[in-house]
Amino acid sequence: MSRILELPLLAATPENIAPFGELVGVDRGRPTSRTRFYDDAVELVEKPRFISDADTCLSVARVRPRALEVIWMERHFKHTQAFLPLNGQPYAVVVAPPGEAELPDLSAVRAFSFDGDCGFLMHLGTWHEFPFALAQPLDLVVILRNETNRNLDAIADGEAVGEDLQKRHIGKRFDVTLRITRRSAGA
Protein backbone atom coordinates (compact mmCIF):
# COMPACT_ATOMS: atom_id res chain seq x y z
CA MET A 1 0.00 0.00 0.00
CA SER A 2 1.35 3.42 -0.92
CA ARG A 3 2.10 6.06 1.66
CA ILE A 4 0.07 9.27 1.80
CA LEU A 5 1.74 12.67 1.58
CA GLU A 6 -0.55 15.50 2.67
CA LEU A 7 -0.35 18.84 0.87
CA PRO A 8 -1.79 21.70 2.94
CA LEU A 9 -3.72 24.14 0.77
CA LEU A 10 -1.97 27.54 0.75
CA ALA A 11 -3.57 30.75 -0.49
CA ALA A 12 -1.96 31.79 -3.78
CA THR A 13 -0.19 35.13 -3.31
CA PRO A 14 2.37 36.82 -5.58
CA GLU A 15 5.08 36.02 -3.03
CA ASN A 16 4.43 32.34 -2.37
CA ILE A 17 3.61 31.44 -5.98
CA ALA A 18 6.78 33.16 -7.31
CA PRO A 19 9.00 30.03 -7.47
CA PHE A 20 6.40 28.39 -9.72
CA GLY A 21 4.88 31.22 -11.78
CA GLU A 22 2.82 34.39 -11.62
CA LEU A 23 -0.72 35.38 -10.78
CA VAL A 24 -2.67 36.86 -13.68
CA GLY A 25 -5.33 39.40 -12.78
CA VAL A 26 -6.14 42.88 -11.57
CA ASP A 27 -4.99 43.89 -8.07
CA ARG A 28 -2.39 41.12 -7.89
CA GLY A 29 0.58 43.31 -7.01
CA ARG A 30 1.56 44.18 -10.58
CA PRO A 31 2.15 47.76 -11.74
CA THR A 32 -0.53 49.39 -13.87
CA SER A 33 -0.58 52.10 -16.51
CA ARG A 34 -3.28 53.99 -18.36
CA THR A 35 -3.65 54.19 -22.10
CA ARG A 36 -3.87 57.62 -23.67
CA PHE A 37 -6.96 56.48 -25.52
CA TYR A 38 -10.51 56.13 -24.13
CA ASP A 39 -10.19 59.08 -21.72
CA ASP A 40 -8.16 57.00 -19.24
CA ALA A 41 -11.03 54.52 -18.90
CA VAL A 42 -8.68 51.62 -19.67
CA GLU A 43 -6.08 50.68 -17.08
CA LEU A 44 -3.50 48.12 -18.20
CA VAL A 45 -1.96 45.71 -15.72
CA GLU A 46 1.68 44.89 -16.44
CA LYS A 47 1.58 41.65 -18.37
CA PRO A 48 3.24 38.49 -17.12
CA ARG A 49 5.91 36.92 -19.32
CA PHE A 50 4.27 34.29 -21.55
CA ILE A 51 6.63 32.15 -23.63
CA SER A 52 5.75 30.13 -26.73
CA ASP A 53 7.74 29.90 -29.92
CA ALA A 54 5.10 28.14 -32.01
CA ASP A 55 1.41 27.69 -32.72
CA THR A 56 -0.42 28.28 -29.44
CA CYS A 57 -3.89 27.09 -28.50
CA LEU A 58 -6.58 28.55 -26.26
CA SER A 59 -8.89 25.79 -25.02
CA VAL A 60 -11.82 26.09 -22.66
CA ALA A 61 -12.13 23.31 -20.08
CA ARG A 62 -14.92 22.54 -17.65
CA VAL A 63 -13.37 20.99 -14.54
CA ARG A 64 -15.76 19.19 -12.21
CA PRO A 65 -14.93 18.53 -8.56
CA ARG A 66 -12.92 15.33 -8.11
CA ALA A 67 -10.91 13.67 -5.34
CA LEU A 68 -8.16 16.03 -4.18
CA GLU A 69 -5.43 13.54 -5.03
CA VAL A 70 -2.61 14.09 -7.49
CA ILE A 71 -2.42 11.37 -10.10
CA TRP A 72 -0.28 13.03 -12.75
CA MET A 73 2.33 15.76 -12.81
CA GLU A 74 3.62 17.20 -16.05
CA ARG A 75 5.92 19.92 -17.29
CA HIS A 76 6.54 21.77 -20.53
CA PHE A 77 9.88 22.73 -22.06
CA LYS A 78 8.82 25.16 -24.81
CA HIS A 79 5.99 27.23 -23.35
CA THR A 80 4.63 28.70 -20.16
CA GLN A 81 1.18 27.18 -19.69
CA ALA A 82 -1.57 29.34 -18.22
CA PHE A 83 -4.91 28.67 -16.52
CA LEU A 84 -7.43 31.56 -16.58
CA PRO A 85 -10.78 31.07 -14.77
CA LEU A 86 -13.95 32.24 -16.48
CA ASN A 87 -16.70 31.73 -13.92
CA GLY A 88 -15.20 32.93 -10.63
CA GLN A 89 -15.12 29.50 -8.98
CA PRO A 90 -12.33 28.68 -6.51
CA TYR A 91 -9.74 26.15 -7.61
CA ALA A 92 -6.48 24.55 -6.54
CA VAL A 93 -3.26 23.93 -8.42
CA VAL A 94 -0.50 21.53 -7.33
CA VAL A 95 3.01 22.43 -8.48
CA ALA A 96 6.68 21.59 -8.04
CA PRO A 97 9.57 23.81 -9.12
CA PRO A 98 11.33 23.37 -12.45
CA GLY A 99 14.49 21.28 -12.36
CA GLU A 100 16.81 19.08 -14.37
CA ALA A 101 15.57 15.78 -12.89
CA GLU A 102 13.23 13.50 -14.82
CA LEU A 103 10.71 13.58 -11.95
CA PRO A 104 9.37 16.30 -9.65
CA ASP A 105 10.95 16.76 -6.21
CA LEU A 106 8.18 15.55 -3.89
CA SER A 107 9.63 17.49 -0.95
CA ALA A 108 9.03 20.72 -2.91
CA VAL A 109 5.45 20.00 -4.09
CA ARG A 110 2.94 22.66 -2.99
CA ALA A 111 -0.83 23.06 -3.30
CA PHE A 112 -2.28 26.54 -3.81
CA SER A 113 -5.86 27.77 -3.66
CA PHE A 114 -7.11 30.46 -6.01
CA ASP A 115 -10.26 32.47 -5.32
CA GLY A 116 -11.44 32.31 -8.93
CA ASP A 117 -10.68 35.98 -9.63
CA CYS A 118 -7.18 35.43 -11.01
CA GLY A 119 -5.31 33.05 -13.24
CA PHE A 120 -1.95 31.35 -13.03
CA LEU A 121 0.93 31.51 -15.54
CA MET A 122 3.60 28.91 -14.82
CA HIS A 123 7.32 29.33 -15.26
CA LEU A 124 8.89 27.26 -18.00
CA GLY A 125 9.34 23.68 -16.76
CA THR A 126 7.14 23.95 -13.65
CA TRP A 127 5.70 20.56 -12.72
CA HIS A 128 1.92 20.66 -12.26
CA GLU A 129 -1.29 18.68 -12.05
CA PHE A 130 -4.38 19.91 -13.90
CA PRO A 131 -6.40 22.30 -11.67
CA PHE A 132 -8.92 21.00 -9.15
CA ALA A 133 -12.37 22.58 -8.82
CA LEU A 134 -12.92 23.24 -5.11
CA ALA A 135 -16.69 23.80 -5.09
CA GLN A 136 -18.75 24.06 -8.27
CA PRO A 137 -17.54 23.17 -11.76
CA LEU A 138 -14.74 25.46 -12.89
CA ASP A 139 -14.63 26.87 -16.42
CA LEU A 140 -11.17 27.97 -17.44
CA VAL A 141 -9.11 28.95 -20.43
CA VAL A 142 -6.03 26.77 -20.87
CA ILE A 143 -3.25 28.31 -22.95
CA LEU A 144 -0.67 25.90 -24.33
CA ARG A 145 1.19 24.94 -27.48
CA ASN A 146 -0.56 22.76 -30.04
CA GLU A 147 2.53 20.54 -29.99
CA THR A 148 1.68 19.70 -26.37
CA ASN A 149 -1.77 18.49 -27.42
CA ARG A 150 -0.08 16.18 -29.93
CA ASN A 151 2.43 15.04 -27.29
CA LEU A 152 -0.48 13.93 -25.08
CA ASP A 153 -1.18 11.25 -27.70
CA ALA A 154 2.42 9.94 -27.62
CA ILE A 155 2.11 7.30 -24.89
CA ALA A 156 5.08 5.30 -23.60
CA ASP A 157 4.61 2.95 -20.63
CA GLY A 158 1.29 4.63 -19.83
CA GLU A 159 2.74 8.15 -19.68
CA ALA A 160 2.74 10.93 -22.27
CA VAL A 161 6.09 12.11 -23.60
CA GLY A 162 7.25 14.50 -26.28
CA GLU A 163 9.54 17.39 -27.07
CA ASP A 164 7.33 19.77 -25.05
CA LEU A 165 5.91 17.39 -22.46
CA GLN A 166 6.75 14.97 -19.69
CA LYS A 167 3.63 13.61 -17.98
CA ARG A 168 4.42 11.29 -15.07
CA HIS A 169 2.13 9.01 -13.05
CA ILE A 170 3.03 10.00 -9.49
CA GLY A 171 1.60 6.94 -7.73
CA LYS A 172 3.40 4.48 -9.98
CA ARG A 173 6.68 6.40 -10.00
CA PHE A 174 6.88 7.04 -6.25
CA ASP A 175 4.43 4.58 -4.63
CA VAL A 176 2.81 7.57 -2.93
CA THR A 177 -0.54 9.35 -2.89
CA LEU A 178 -0.33 13.15 -2.82
CA ARG A 179 -3.49 14.40 -1.13
CA ILE A 180 -4.56 18.04 -0.83
CA THR A 181 -5.79 18.89 2.66
CA ARG A 182 -7.98 21.90 3.27
CA ARG A 183 -6.36 22.73 6.59
CA SER A 184 -3.80 25.48 6.24
CA ALA A 185 -0.07 24.92 6.60
CA GLY A 186 1.04 25.26 10.20
CA ALA A 187 -2.43 24.44 11.56
What do these predicted ranges mean?
Residues S113-W127:
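Conserved metal-binding segment of the jelly-roll/cupin
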Residues T126-E159:
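A short beta-strand-loop micro-motif that forms or neighbors metal/cofactor-
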Residues R110, C118, Q136-D139:
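A short pocket-lining beta-strand/turn micro-motif at the edge of beta-sheets
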Residues Q81-L84, G119-F120, P131:
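His/acidic/aromatic-lined binding-pocket segments of jelly-roll/cupin-type domains
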Residues M1-A111, N149-A187:
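Non-catalytic, conserved peripheral segments adjacent to functional cores
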